[in-house]
Amino acid sequence: MIALIQRVSRASVVVDNQTIGAIDKGLLVLLGVEREDNREKMEKLATKVMSYRVFSDENGKMNLNLTQAGGSLLVVSQFTLAADTERGLRPSFSGAGTPEQALGLYEEFVAFCRTKGVNTETGQFAADMKVELVNDGPVTFHLQV
């Protein structure tokens, strides 16, 4: 399971000209599901995302996690993160999870974060989305479990 996280000062997702998810300070999480992923990996990755210290403390060091910084999550499904790009000029998605598997783990990821008290907004699974963000830093990390 893969999460590309970006520290943002604001981010939003639009589907059919309607904003369906928006946050101010927090993390935009692009979430990719691979074939071998399961609930255990999902919980490990969600915990890591919420605990990852990417927000600055009073000394300007990245010492604070999402909760300590008072941030929110915007979680967007992104199957292209599971692409194999090693060979050729076209990505292969054979390692990506099935749509059913990905939807289930995506929904569980969001629910897990919410049960931990994190304000969590979402995109729309498998929709054509327009994602707008102001990357704060920029600070971007690729997390994989």
From Swiss-Prot:
Catalytic activity: glycyl-tRNA(Ala) + H2O = tRNA(Ala) + glycine + H(+); a D-aminoacyl-tRNA + H2O = a tRNA + a D-alpha-amino acid + H(+)
Key words of the record: Cytoplasm, Hydrolase, RNA-binding, tRNA-binding
Gene3D superfamilies: D-tyrosyl-tRNA(Tyr) deacylase
Predominant location: cytoplasm
EC number, as in UniProt: 3.1.1.96
One example of a Gene Ontology biological process annotation: D-amino acid catabolic process
Motif interval(s): Gly-cisPro motif, important for rejection of L-amino acids: 137-138
Gene Ontology cellular-component terms listed: cytoplasm
Major enzyme class: hydrolase
Keyword hit for Cytoplasm: yes
Localization terms from the record: Cytoplasm
Listed InterPro entries: Daa-tRNA_deacyls_DTD, DTD-like_sf
GO molecular function terms noted in the UniProt entry: D-tyrosyl-tRNA(Tyr) deacylase activity; Gly-tRNA(Ala) deacylase activity; Ser(Gly)-tRNA(Ala) hydrolase activity; tRNA binding
Family, similarity comment: Belongs to the DTD family.
Described purpose of this protein according to its UniProt entry: An aminoacyl-tRNA editing enzyme that deacylates mischarged D-aminoacyl-tRNAs. Also deacylates mischarged glycyl-tRNA(Ala), protecting cells against glycine mischarging by AlaRS. Acts via tRNA-based rather than protein-based catalysis; rejects L-amino acids rather than detecting D-amino acids in the active site. By recycling D-aminoacyl-tRNA to D-amino acids and free tRNA molecules, this enzyme counteracts the toxicity associated with the formation of D-aminoacyl-tRNA entities in vivo and helps enforce protein L-homochirality.
Comment, domains: A Gly-cisPro motif from one monomer fits into the active site of the other monomer to allow specific chiral rejection of L-amino acids.
Assembly behavior: Homodimer.
PANTHER family to which the protein is assigned, alphabetical: D-AMINOACYL-TRNA DEACYLASE 1 (PTHR10472:SF5), D-TYROSYL-TRNA TYR DEACYLASE (PTHR10472)
Cited NCBIfam families: D-aminoacyl-tRNA deacylase
Name the UniProt record assigns to this protein: D-aminoacyl-tRNA deacylase
Organism: Shewanella oneidensis (strain ATCC 700550 / JCM 31522 / CIP 106686 / LMG 19005 / NCIMB 14063 / MR-1)
